[in-house]
Structures are given as C-alpha cells and as structure tokens.
Amino acid sequence: MKKFFAISIILLLSSCFRDWSYQGSTGPKHWGDLKEDYKFCKIGYNQSPIDITFPAIENGKDYELKFSYHPSEVEKEQQSQNVKFSFFSKDFVTFRKRDYFLQKIYFHHPSEHLVKGEQQILEMHIFHKSENEQSLALAIFVKVGKENAEFNKMIDLLDNNKKGAVAKINLAKIVKKEDKFFFYDGSKTTPPCKEGVKWFVMKTPIEMSKEQINKIINLGLKGKANARPVQKFAPEKY
C-alpha cells in the first residue's frame, strides 16, 4: 500500500513539471526530439521568434487591427517555465473581418523577438483565438522607464497565493492602438511550436519601472530566462 502511494505521488509530481525547458538536454535545441508532438520545433518552416529586419507597417488598410478591449477579470496560473494570465472576457481584436478573442498573456525574459539584432529586457505576448481556432498574437516589447499603473494589478496577483484570486485589467491602457507594427506568419514560441500564428510585433516598446520589471522576472519567471532563440525566417514569403 505504501509503495502504491509513493508511486502515485511521484506520478502526480511528474505531471506538474513540463518535459521541456530552456536549458541543457531539454532546452530549445532539443525540443523537436523530445516528443513526436514537438516535431515542428525542429522541422517547422515558419517558426517563431525571429530577428526582424523588414520595415514596420501602419495600422490600417490591408493590415488594420481593430481593438475591442475593456476592463476584464484575469487570473494567474504559475507554470514551471512561465506565468500565465488568463482572461474571463469576450474582448477581441478584428483582423480582415475575423474576430480573434482574447485568451491569455505570457512574459518572456529577455525578449524573444529581436529588431535588427536588438533585444529588450522583457516581452509580453497577448494571445487571441478565432472561433475556427486560428491564433493571433500581439508581441509588445518592454523597456525600463516610468511606472505603468496597469501592470501593478498583475504584479499584485503574482504576490497573491490565494486560489482563485483575480484582478481587473484594461488592455486598452497598455496596447498602443496607433503604433506601427511588424507582421509575419509564425508559430507558438514554446512546444509543440504549432504554426499558423499571425504575429503583430509592436514597434514601440512600452515602459515599466525597473522595480516592476524585476518583480515580473523574479516572481513570475522565478528569476530565470525563458526566451527561445530566434529562428530562421523565410522573407521571400513577404
């Protein structure tokens, strides 16, 4: 009985940890070999992130993004490699007459995308999904600057270990609707590296105070880097 109980505990604990990481034998170079489901991390043609060398475009005409963001409740979920903020809302963005509904936010340190080789200290990914399961992601660079009051609500959640704790976040106060962005078709930046993600990488970084950035890195990311290296880009498609 004791042996059965011990095995059950081991299986339960192992299920709480991911089989991939950002270091060593389970790091990004090996993701594609860890599982059949992860094969696109190795053989995918449109993988993310990338080093962006092409021009930014205006938010308009063929690449117009319409935002429908309002104050929405968000809940955190601590993961082994990251922290996920999940939204309980019907907020969405519209691109080419299709609505993509707000799903979740992740942070990466340092930034995963580069712009002509330049990397920022932090990058925020806002994921959306359409009714037919297509993904659209906003990538927003973060740099050290003025305190951003809206992010204090997320940081307070990181400090709150109470199960089911929520905060109300207004992304309309974070996302700069008038900003230029870089657009390309890519993938999720973590296993299984599924492709078909429409990436909108905002050109202008937003600001957070050094203290805010450090809290996100230390509390949310456990002080560890979690950026996938840039992938080969196929510019002939654009």
Region annotations inferred by a language model:
Residues M1-F4, G117:
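Positively charged n-region of N-terminal signal peptides that target proteins for export
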Residues F4-L13:
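Sec-dependent N-terminal signal peptides
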